[in-house]
């Protein structure tokens, strides 16, 4: 059976990994994240690798390999060739839904592209330093980042991310939900937002916000507990980031009991 592979690459960008070079057929990016970089616009990108033969299983991929009556019987796999998938998205999906990025958002995202590689270097550099601090902090029970040898995906990280992965990760603080929120509320330059991959450092408590509608079993499957804190490390100076995490106040990690 023919199967196409689609990769959602919202948390990583082409500067770190190129999924099509590893066999992906379709790659989806959230331009709102690293591409724009400032959480100021909404947009997305769909990249068609152009290597998948949609006609080899015409029944399964009938929208691409069989005639489209709304276009006088045109077969997208014949008319557009390697670009059949993205061509149908523009010709049919956009036609039917009317989705279109605003010119101003497009302008902002294009500006973001100009500094993408530079920003990502700083994101990754900062994130690895925060991970290194947290993993050695006695008030932290676990850090979930693939760069760490005990992470279940560490081997994949070493294989596919020789330049380092993204800057979004979680950790478990000792003391449960109460201590998690004490820590979150104490952070000053971190913004409490559900967005990620912003130049601003972001923090959130998934258990009571983004994933609060999940059942206990679903939360367990996602390894989300009352102690889980998600960080999206920004491009601020690393000394400023670490100083916020490590200030001698009862609400900060160095003295949480």
Show which residues each predicted segment covers.
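Single conserved hydrophobic/aromatic residue that forms the stacking wall/gate
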Residues: 1-13, 246, 250-257
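PLP-dependent enzyme catalytic core of the Aspartate aminotransferase-like
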Residues: 119, 176, 185-186, 201-248, ...
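Alpha-helical elements of the RecA-like P-loop NTPase motor core of helicases
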Residues: 17, 132, 181, 239, ...
